Amino acid sequence: MAVSLPWDAGPPLTHTLTSTVEMPLIPDQPPQFELVPTSRSRNRVRVVCLGGGTGLSMILRGVKRISNVTAVVTTTDDGGSSGRLRRDFGMPAPGDVRHCLSALAEDESLVNQLFEHRFTDGELAGHSFGNLFLAGLTDLLGSFDQAVSESARVLAVVGRVVPSTTDMVELVAEMEDGRTVRGETAIAADGSSIRTVRLDPPDPAAHPRALQAIERADLIVMGPGSLFTSTLPPLLVPGIREAVRAAKVPRIYVCNLLQQPGETEGYRASDHIGRIYEHVGDDLVDAVLVSRNRAEHGVPVPVDRGGLRRQGVRVFGARLAGEWQHDADKLGRTLVRLSRWNRDELQ
């Protein structure tokens, strides 16, 4: 299916997008991007993905072989193995970082499988080998940052995994009923509507390599994943949100396929953007990428183009849904093609 554009984009990259991305763009919205042939369209683009959880690791598998990717990862997980290691060793949560390292591993080797192996018996029950490996290296080297770098070397990682911060931070939620819930795990398990989330302490230092990657990116991707406990935490780190806001490249929010019980029940696509803006200010998202087909299970997130238009956000669509989540390969190819849109001007 040919791409429909509300302005003349020229033939070269229009052809590249044909039959892969269907874009129901808003015709009365001034263009924020222009399609222009650049030298990087023939090379591997630099993609920065922010978030955590299974959503981030899925997207990394989709882009790792067709881009130079950097994952900027949340470190607020305090449950299970990650939580125990945080408390015992005073280190940032390793779980989301471990998932990203495994997702970016060169191949699914035995070492990679070992990294994801979770013990089921004895005193190690619940721990994954990868978390213990990261904890051991952190203890040996005296640096979680160095532990991540050495783990990436062992796994022959394609791309880079960078913690959003290596400071010890806790996620805190203010619920709609007025209660305060502390800790990512407790927030996710509470089941009540979330009003806001914040970091404690509120001013952790952003990782310098995260800021550098954002500054050099050709495309910045937020989501998919749990809005309050995966997508927002990296953006709450001072310095990161400012770097994303200052970026002169497309900033894409990949909308979740499904509403998430306890976090985003009843949310439309514009509600996701609205909550991001309430937490970190507006002008942080240029476009929302949605799936034009539905997952086979779960309650889909309605795409309200009118609400997104009022927020100044464009809508891009492609057939991206698998059974439960996005098809990683389709999503990766679509995002790399969208990186060829250059922002026309800062709003």
Which residue stretches match the model-derived regions?
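Short, conserved loop/helix-junction motifs that constitute active-site signature segments
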Residues: V63-N68, E242-K248, Y277-V285
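An anion/phosphate-binding loop that grips the pyrophosphate of nucleotide cofactors and donors
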Residues: A217
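Electropositive, gly/pro-rich neighborhoods at or near active sites that engage anionic ligands
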Residues: A2-V21, T74-S192, R198, V336-R340
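Charged helix-capping and loop-helix junction motifs
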Residues: P234-R241, Y267-I273
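C-terminal functional extensions of proteins
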Residues: A2-P31, G266-Q347
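Gly/lys/ser-thr-rich phosphate-binding loops in alpha/beta enzymes
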Residues: Q32-M91, G95
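Glycine/threonine-rich flexible loop motifs
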Residues: L227-V237, G298-P302
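Active-site glycine-rich loop that binds ribose-phosphate moieties when present
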Residues: T196-A213, L236, D271
